[in-house]
């Protein structure tokens, strides 16, 4: 997923779904800064602690509704979503992209999930996948 963002190292990247922090760590090696939004406070605290202990100082982990992104830090040079959205990516995320930047997100359409890269109004289906669903609303 990180490779699909085609980063050059100067970007601020948004990650939706921190989980353990592994993908945020990978992104931190490819981007200038990573803002990672995790719905579950316990996961966010643990991932944030681990990332700091391991020296990933360019990662900021927040608790929140990832479908809303982090508009206070937008625009982003790439957005990676690690949970499946239904039919389309959340509009708020697309609005937070820099022109020419990519959003990579698993999408469920018609009972099938695919990893899709969205860029400048176009979409590219990459592969079939299976992710947890994207949960919206206040954590």
Where are these regions (language model features)?
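Conserved nucleotide-cofactor-binding alpha/beta core module
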Residues: 6-125
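SAM-dependent Rossmann-like transferase core, predominantly class I methyltransferases
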Residues: 2-4
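Conserved histidine-centered catalytic loops in small-molecule metabolism enzymes
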Residues: 123-136
